[in-house]
Amino acid sequence: MVMGLGLFLLVFMLGLGLTPPTLAQDNPRYRDFLAKHYDATPQGRNDRYCESTMRRRHLTSPCKDINTFVHGNRHHITAICGDENGSPYGGNLRISTSPFQVTTCKLRGGSPRPPCQYRATRGSRNIVVGCENGLPVHLDESIFRP
């Protein structure tokens, strides 16, 4: 009886531990947010970084006018949607309580057609996100422009 209860508790606790990542993987808006805005360990953070990363992530057809990549720990970004690293910022937005390293890629020239050329701006700042079910799904780039 004790062994059966112990096994049940073990399976239950493992199930709890696996639930959040599974839910995150099942949220297409969260996956899209990560694809567009998350880069844990960037190489370079210069104009060439912007051009290659934007192209690799399919953000250049047509050329996207501006895009910001957030660097660092994914958990800290997700925590903005809760009280651990975020606070309300009007409407459904939340602002981080700690700054993040970011690279903002801004389109040079006026043509929305490839080849896209970008200018990189590196910085550290608090970021504003829109959240859905406790996960970031939108980076509000209108709040902070380079």
Swiss-Prot record:
<keyword id="KW-0346">Stress response</keyword>
<dbReference type="GO" id="GO:0004519">
    <property type="term" value="F:endonuclease activity"/>
</dbReference>
<keyword id="KW-0217">Developmental protein</keyword>
<dbReference type="InterPro" id="IPR023412">
    <property type="entry name" value="RNaseA_domain"/>
</dbReference>
<dbReference type="GO" id="GO:0045087">
    <property type="term" value="P:innate immune response"/>
</dbReference>
<comment type="subunit">
    <text>Homodimer. Interacts with RNH1; inhibiting ANG ribonuclease activity. Interacts with PCNA.</text>
</comment>
<dbReference type="InterPro" id="IPR036816">
    <property type="entry name" value="RNaseA-like_dom_sf"/>
</dbReference>
<keyword id="KW-0378">Hydrolase</keyword>
<dbReference type="InterPro" id="IPR023411">
    <property type="entry name" value="RNaseA_AS"/>
</dbReference>
<keyword id="KW-0652">Protein synthesis inhibitor</keyword>
<dbReference type="GO" id="GO:0032311">
    <property type="term" value="C:angiogenin-PRI complex"/>
</dbReference>
<dbReference type="GO" id="GO:0048662">
    <property type="term" value="P:negative regulation of smooth muscle cell proliferation"/>
</dbReference>
<keyword id="KW-0221">Differentiation</keyword>
<dbReference type="GO" id="GO:0032055">
    <property type="term" value="P:negative regulation of translation in response to stress"/>
</dbReference>
<dbReference type="GO" id="GO:0023052">
    <property type="term" value="P:signaling"/>
</dbReference>
<feature type="short sequence motif" description="Nucleolar localization signal">
    <location>
        <begin position="55"/>
        <end position="59"/>
    </location>
</feature>
<dbReference type="GO" id="GO:0001666">
    <property type="term" value="P:response to hypoxia"/>
</dbReference>
<keyword id="KW-1015">Disulfide bond</keyword>
<dbReference type="GO" id="GO:0009303">
    <property type="term" value="P:rRNA transcription"/>
</dbReference>
<keyword id="KW-0238">DNA-binding</keyword>
<dbReference type="GO" id="GO:0003779">
    <property type="term" value="F:actin binding"/>
</dbReference>
<dbReference type="GO" id="GO:0005507">
    <property type="term" value="F:copper ion binding"/>
</dbReference>
<dbReference type="GO" id="GO:0050830">
    <property type="term" value="P:defense response to Gram-positive bacterium"/>
</dbReference>
<feature type="modified residue" description="Pyrrolidone carboxylic acid">
    <location>
        <position position="25"/>
    </location>
</feature>
<dbReference type="GO" id="GO:0004549">
    <property type="term" value="F:tRNA-specific ribonuclease activity"/>
</dbReference>
<comment type="function">
    <text>Secreted ribonuclease that can either promote or restrict cell proliferation of target cells, depending on the context. Endocytosed in target cells via its receptor PLXNB2 and translocates to the cytoplasm or nucleus. Under stress conditions, localizes to the cytoplasm and promotes the assembly of stress granules (SGs): specifically cleaves a subset of tRNAs within anticodon loops to produce tRNA-derived stress-induced fragments (tiRNAs), resulting in translation repression and inhibition of cell proliferation. tiRNas also prevent formation of apoptosome, thereby promoting cell survival.</text>
</comment>
<comment type="similarity">
    <text>Belongs to the pancreatic ribonuclease family.</text>
</comment>
<dbReference type="GO" id="GO:0034063">
    <property type="term" value="P:stress granule assembly"/>
</dbReference>
<dbReference type="GO" id="GO:0050714">
    <property type="term" value="P:positive regulation of protein secretion"/>
</dbReference>
<dbReference type="GO" id="GO:0005102">
    <property type="term" value="F:signaling receptor binding"/>
</dbReference>
<dbReference type="GO" id="GO:0003677">
    <property type="term" value="F:DNA binding"/>
</dbReference>
<dbReference type="GO" id="GO:0001938">
    <property type="term" value="P:positive regulation of endothelial cell proliferation"/>
</dbReference>
<keyword id="KW-0539">Nucleus</keyword>
<dbReference type="GO" id="GO:0005730">
    <property type="term" value="C:nucleolus"/>
</dbReference>
<dbReference type="GO" id="GO:0005604">
    <property type="term" value="C:basement membrane"/>
</dbReference>
<dbReference type="GO" id="GO:0030041">
    <property type="term" value="P:actin filament polymerization"/>
</dbReference>
<dbReference type="Pfam" id="PF00074">
    <property type="entry name" value="RnaseA"/>
</dbReference>
<keyword id="KW-0873">Pyrrolidone carboxylic acid</keyword>
<feature type="signal peptide">
    <location>
        <begin position="1"/>
        <end position="24"/>
    </location>
</feature>
<feature type="active site" description="Proton acceptor">
    <location>
        <position position="37"/>
    </location>
</feature>
<dbReference type="GO" id="GO:0061844">
    <property type="term" value="P:antimicrobial humoral immune response mediated by antimicrobial peptide"/>
</dbReference>
<dbReference type="GO" id="GO:0005615">
    <property type="term" value="C:extracellular space"/>
</dbReference>
